[in-house]
């Protein structure tokens, strides 16, 4: 551009150049070269040199030179104005292009955000893994090898390049691509609407079934079906979480690849910076050489030029040589000026690019450090809503468990009362059996009395026939009347005993029915408790998974935002220049088309956002109404359950009143039968047996209590060890968190990325090993607890044997004491010295073989050598771990504690 503009004034005015010598052309050609921004120091030096040479060699009229100079200055001003106008237009076009690109990027981001929102909403609504397949479409899109200003359209059309000559075809293709994308989003919306409708139908069916429930059995069946549905939903959620975890791993691998490419790009940038510094040094050396050459040339010209030749207007004999040298110098200086200007412009552009990159990095760091940015993120809000939902369900299940526990205490009291009454019924049954045997004896006596009565009647008839005495008749009549009265009394008593026996049988049947109902209720209670425990465990596992996913997603988002922006911004200088040239050439052609297309996109985006907001409002209102209806239904169910509980309590009170009346009747019967029971001698024997059995049961109860206390102590010890292991695990988790924070800090430093990642991997592996070792220790402690419980039984058996042996040893001690008394004092002292030496040897054996101070606490499993814990800890800190005794290599898992 600049060379063409500098050649135009030379072609327009040939008559001025003909009247001037070639040296004047050389002088006038230097101001005809326009510069857009500023004139460097080479122009000033060259103009001074040319003026001096021309003043010494050429005698030209001052007026002609002034006119030529004025015209050339005017041309230069015009060209500068034109250049300034062109630059202002280019800047305006660049600003429009950047604003257009920013708006396109924002529209694309909003579109992608809408698609992601729809996918996650479908996941929350209970969609299958088909919803996540839409994410693959976005992941599979690659960056096309085209200009920077055409990347969005190329990615939209999925084409490597665009033909700018046919703008109508480009617009048509863009419209088709937008229609396809709109249709895909509408399909996604339809899929999610279907899933939401299915969920609504499920909820309505559940609510209808709950309304139709009339008995407790139906309620339990419905609750089991609801639990099955909840399990299916939890399985779906787990599958979706696993799929997201797989995607998370893929993205982490891509991020690592981006980090490696970023490190290579930075090394290339450093290499280019070194080359730039070398080129700068070469330019400075060339400038110094030019200055020295100019000084030498000035000195040579002053020595060779003479004054008379200048006065007469003739030239010196060395003029052609000076002209050629001047032309060569001028050409070389022009080339050097062009190279210097190009290098300076490249350096300025690279500096501006680096400044923009540093600003973007600072903005990214500020956004990442800002907590509000994290709290306002979409993923954080979704996870927070999910956590609130699970917390609400937790509270609901806690309330249910508390109500069940309250009912449990009531049921336990009722169970105790029924057990007491059952025992009293058993005692009454025993008494009724004894009374029944007594009744049978009395019936036999009655039959014998009836036989005697018949015999007496026959005898009286015979006596009446034999004798006619009135006294004997009266006596026999009195005897018969007394016998009849006694018979009636005995029959009345028999009827009473039969009625009491029937009542006792009826009470026994009622007690059995109550026991069956109690057992059924206890089974139901256990089932509900198991279900509650399972649901609590599932909730805890889901919470732990959610927390892990939160942490990993936050780290991945930070890394992805850093890497993607740095990788997208790392372009070469040549690509940027090519893209700028193409953008300047295509700006005028695409301006009108892009403005219209941009207006259409804006209108469509506004309509779509309005429709999406209205749909979200409608869905939110529908969800609120559904939740309100569910609340009303739950309140009604609670009221119905309370009424049923009240009815059951009233029935229980009525049954208790009936039992009390029966007990009172039974007590009345006992008062009536006390006279008969006093005559029974077997009662005393039975009481003696009961006393002996009660003594035996008390003794067994005391033994069970002692065993229970021992087991509780062992459980406390095991719980203490488990708590210690939990504390170690928490400490290890804190160490893991610290390692992650250090790794995140080290990621920001580009030089130490690989080292920091390797160290964190090793630390994580060690922590996993320690965690596994702790798990194995917990399992071993559980096994030890089982072994201890077995050993206690063996020890109890051994105690009896030891007691017997103790008696034998005591007898032997008595004999030995007698022998020692017989022995002298010298032999006793010698034996004491020997025993002391043996004790010292035993103590030395129990001490560590490295330090000889501390006792042996740790064993190495490979060689079974014993040492103290501190000496082994020192060897564990060393990388090459060897046994101090035999030199065999061992690992951290080969060291075990030993109780001496």
Swiss-Prot record:
Annotated GO biological process: chromatin organization; innate immune response; leaf morphogenesis; protein ubiquitination; seed dormancy process; vegetative to reproductive phase transition of meristem
Classification via SUPFAM superfamilies: RING/U-box
EC code: 2.3.2.27
Reaction catalysis annotation: S-ubiquitinyl-[E2 ubiquitin-conjugating enzyme]-L-cysteine + [acceptor protein]-L-lysine = [E2 ubiquitin-conjugating enzyme]-L-cysteine + N(6)-ubiquitinyl-[acceptor protein]-L-lysine
Record localization: Nucleus
Keywords in alphabetical order: Chromatin regulator, Coiled coil, Metal-binding, Nucleus, Transferase, Ubl conjugation pathway, Zinc, Zinc-finger
InterPro entries, alphabetized: E3_ubiquit_lig_Bre1, Znf_RING, Znf_RING/FYVE/PHD, Znf_RING_CS
Name of the featured protein: E3 ubiquitin-protein ligase BRE1-like 2
Annotated spans, Disordered: 1-31
Compositional bias ranges of the Polar residues kind: 20-31
GO CC annotations, alphabetized: HULC complex; nucleus
Zinc finger (RING-type) stretch: 848-887
Subunit structure: May act as a tetramer consisting of two copies of HUB1 and two copies of HUB2.
Job of this protein: E3 ubiquitin-protein ligase that monoubiquitinates H2B to form H2BK143ub1. H2BK143ub1 gives a specific tag for epigenetic transcriptional activation and is also prerequisite for H3K4me and maybe H3K79me. It thereby plays a central role in histone code and gene regulation. Forms a ubiquitin ligase complex in cooperation with the E2 enzyme UBC2/RAD6.
Family: Belongs to the BRE1 family.
Note: HUB1 and HUB2 are involved in the same processes, but are weakly or not redundant.
Coiled coil: 63-96, 217-300, 437-660, 706-737
Phenotype when the gene is knocked out: Plants have reduced seed dormancy and several pleiotropic phenotypes, including alterations in leaf color, plant architecture and flower morphology.
Signal sequence, renumbered to the chain: none
GO molecular function terms attached to this record: protein homodimerization activity; ubiquitin protein ligase activity; zinc ion binding
The gene coding this protein: HUB2
Gene3D superfamilies the record matches: 1.20.5.340, Zinc/RING finger domain, C3HC4 (zinc finger)
PROSITE patterns: ZF_RING_1, ZF_RING_2
Protein's pathway: Protein modification; protein ubiquitination
């Amino acid at each position: 551009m600049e060379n063409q503009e500098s050649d135009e004034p030379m072609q327009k005015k040939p008559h001025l150049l003909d009247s001037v010598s070639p040296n004047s052309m050389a002088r006038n050609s230097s101001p005809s070269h326009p510069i857009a921004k500023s004139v460097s120091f080479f122009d000033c030096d060259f103009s001074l040199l040319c003026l001096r040479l021309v003043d010494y060699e050429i005698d030209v009229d001052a007026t002609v030179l002034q006119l030529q100079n004025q015209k050339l200055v005017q041309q230069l001003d015009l060209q500068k104005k034109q250049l300034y106008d062109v630059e202002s237009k280019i800047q305006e076009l660049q600003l429009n292009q950047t604003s257009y690109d920013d708006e396109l990027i924002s529209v694309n981001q909003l579109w992608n955000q809408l698609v992601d929102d729809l996918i996650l909403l479908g996941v929350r609504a209970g969609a299958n893994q088909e919803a996540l397949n839409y994410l693959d479409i976005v992941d599979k899109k690659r960056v096309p090898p085209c200009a920077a200003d055409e990347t969005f359209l190329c990615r939209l059309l999925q084409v490597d390049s665009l033909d700018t000559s046919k703008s109508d075809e480009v617009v048509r293709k863009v419209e088709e691509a937008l229609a396809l994308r709109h249709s895909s989003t509408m399909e996604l919306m339809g899929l999610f609407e279907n899933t939401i409708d299915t969920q609504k139908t499920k909820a309505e069916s559940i609510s209808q079934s709950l309304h139709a429930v009339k008995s407790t059995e139906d309620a339990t069946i419905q609750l089991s079906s609801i639990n099955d549905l909840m399990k299916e939903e939890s399985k779906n959620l787990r599958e979706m979480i696993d799929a997201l975890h797989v995607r998370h791993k893929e993205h982490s691998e891509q991020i690592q690849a981006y980090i490696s490419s970023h490190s290579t790009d930075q090394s290339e940038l450093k290499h280019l910076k070194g080359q730039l510094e070398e080129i700068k040094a070469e330019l400075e050396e060339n400038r110094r050489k030019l200055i020295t050459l100019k000084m030498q040339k000035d000195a040579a010209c002053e020595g060779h030029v003479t004054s008379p030749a200048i006065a007469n207007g003739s030239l010196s004999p060395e003029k052609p040589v000076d002209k050629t040298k001047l032309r060569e110098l001028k050409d070389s200086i022009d080339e050097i000026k062009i190279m210097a200007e190009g290098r300076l412009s490249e350096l300025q552009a690279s500096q501006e690019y680096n400044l923009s990159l540093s600003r973007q990095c600072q903005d990214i760091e500020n956004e990442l450090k800002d907590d509000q940015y994290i709290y306002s993120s979409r993923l954080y809000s979704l996870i927070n809503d999910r956590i609130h939902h699970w917390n609400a369900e937790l509270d609901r299940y806690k309330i249910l468990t508390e109500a069940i526990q309250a009912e449990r205490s009531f049921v336990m009291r009722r169970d105790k009362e029924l057990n007491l009454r059952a025992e009293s019924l058993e005692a009454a049954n025993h008494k009724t059996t004894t009374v029944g045997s007594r009744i049978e004896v009395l019936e036999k006596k009655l039959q014998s009395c009836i036989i005697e009565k018949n015999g007496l009647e026959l005898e009286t008839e015979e006596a009446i026939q034999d004798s006619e005495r009135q006294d004997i008749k009266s006596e026999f009549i009195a005897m018969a009347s007394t016998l009849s009265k006694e018979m009636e009394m005995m029959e009345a008593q028999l009827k009473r005993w039969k009625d009491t026996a029937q009542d006792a049988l009826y009470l026994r049947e009622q007690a059995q029915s109550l026991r069956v109902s109690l057992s059924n209720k206890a089974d139901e209670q256990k089932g509900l408790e198991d279900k509650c425990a399972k649901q609590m465990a599932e909730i805890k596992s889901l919470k732990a998974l959610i927390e892990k996913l939160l942490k990993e997603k936050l780290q991945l988002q930070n890394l992805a935002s850093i890497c993607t922006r740095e990788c997208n911004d790392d372009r070469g200088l040549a690509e940027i220049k090519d893209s700028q040239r193409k953008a300047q050439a295509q700006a005028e052609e695409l301006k009108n088309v892009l403005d219209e297309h941009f207006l259409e996109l804006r209108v469509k985006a506004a309509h779509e956002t309005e429709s999406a907001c209205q749909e979200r409002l409608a869905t939110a209102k529908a969800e609120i109404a559904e939740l309100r209806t569910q609340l009303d239904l739950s309140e009604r169910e609670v009221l119905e359950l309370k009424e049923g509980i009240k009815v059951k309590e009233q029935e229980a009170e009525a049954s208790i009143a009936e039992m009390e009346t029966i007990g009172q009747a039974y007590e009345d019967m006992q008062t009536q039968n006390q006279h008969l029971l006093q005559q029974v001698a077997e009662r005393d024997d039975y009481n003696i047996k009961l006393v002996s059995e009660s003594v035996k049961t008390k003794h067994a109860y005391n033994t069970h209590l002692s065993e229970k206390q021992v087991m509780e102590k062992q459980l406390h010890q095991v719980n203490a060890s488990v708590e210690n292991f939990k504390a170690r695990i928490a400490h290890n988790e804190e160490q893991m968190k610290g390692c992650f924070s250090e790794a995140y800090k080290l990621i920001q430093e580009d030089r130490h990325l690989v080292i920091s990642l390797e160290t964190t991997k090793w630390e994580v592996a060690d922590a996993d090993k320690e965690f596994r070792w702790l798990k194995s220790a917990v399992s071993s402690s559980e096994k030890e607890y089982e072994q201890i419980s077995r050993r206690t039984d063996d020890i109890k058996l051994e105690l009896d044997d030891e007691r017997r042996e103790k008696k034998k040893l005591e007898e032997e001690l008595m004999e030995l004491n007698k022998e020692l008394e017989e022995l002298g004092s010298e032999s006793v002292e010698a034996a004491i010295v020997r025993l002391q030496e043996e004790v010292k040897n035993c103590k030395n054996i129990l001490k560590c073989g490295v330090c000889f101070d501390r006792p042996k606490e740790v064993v190495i499993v490979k060689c079974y050598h014993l040492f103290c814990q501190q000496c082994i800890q020192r060897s564990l800190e060393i990388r090459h771990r060897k046994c101090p005794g035999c030199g065999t290599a061992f690992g951290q898992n080969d060291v075990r504690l030993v109780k001496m």
